[in-house]
Amino acid sequence: AAGFAAALTGQLQGLSTFIIEKESRIGGASALSGGGVWIPNNHYLQEAGVKDTYENAKTYLDATIGDRVQEILKETYLTRGPEMLRFFHDNTKHIRFKYARNHADYYAHLPGGKPTGRSIEPEIIDLRLLKEWEGLLLEPTISTKGFTMTGQEFHKVNMITQTINGKATSLKLGTRMITSKWTGARYASLGRALIARLALSYKKSGGKFRVNTAFKDFIMEQNRVIGIVVQSNGKELRIKANRGVILGAG
């Protein structure tokens, strides 16, 4: 996800970017994950009515990771993270998240922790929007038997026998499944939705990528990186970079 985000940022700022992926599918571990994003005090949380501040989040990070991470890195994360989410929201039509309420901070009992959590997750997306890129998205490793649900919905449906909210969510999921069969929609959630939304936005921006292409080495000139050497289809290729190279190593 970070590599896609970096390339998309370049595209949105007027640069021409090119992603290489050593595997045959895009997404990596992010596509197989829950897709949750933990960035305190972002605008999605604010819109959901979550009361949070930079100071509270900093207190939580200090209580959980202490001095194992440099202060400048913690400060940058807490400052630039919300800016990143706002940037993608304002400059794309498809990168959208929602608050995953009650996904508690892992150490909610520590100073600055939130029992209701700070996590957000990608909204469900119809993969048909990706068109020819859909087939390049990494397949999930666990089947949900036709049901597509967010992490928040999963939490609610697990309470189906105990709460009205659980029953209502179950009905919502069933309706979504029937609707998808009727319309041909191919919904994705969690990590696949995260990668799909990044990929769709990258595609709309004019970005390009190439799969089955492995990084081999940097091309150097006077101690500067000016490109990369890659291996693709048994051939070694040299790709020049005018503005820089970013490694997305997962």
Where are the regions a protein language model picked out?
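A conserved beta-strand/loop element that lines the FAD pocket in flavoprotein oxidoreductases
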Residues: 202-217, 238-240
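N-terminal Rossmann-like FAD-binding beta1-loop-alpha1 element of flavoenzymes
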Residues: 1-19
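Conserved N-terminal/central alpha/beta ligand/cofactor-binding core
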Residues: 22-208
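Glycine-rich, N-terminal phosphate-binding loop of Rossmann-like dinucleotide-binding domains
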Residues: 41, 249-250
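Acidic, glycine-rich active-site loops and adjacent beta-strand->loop/helix elements
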Residues: 23-25, 215-219
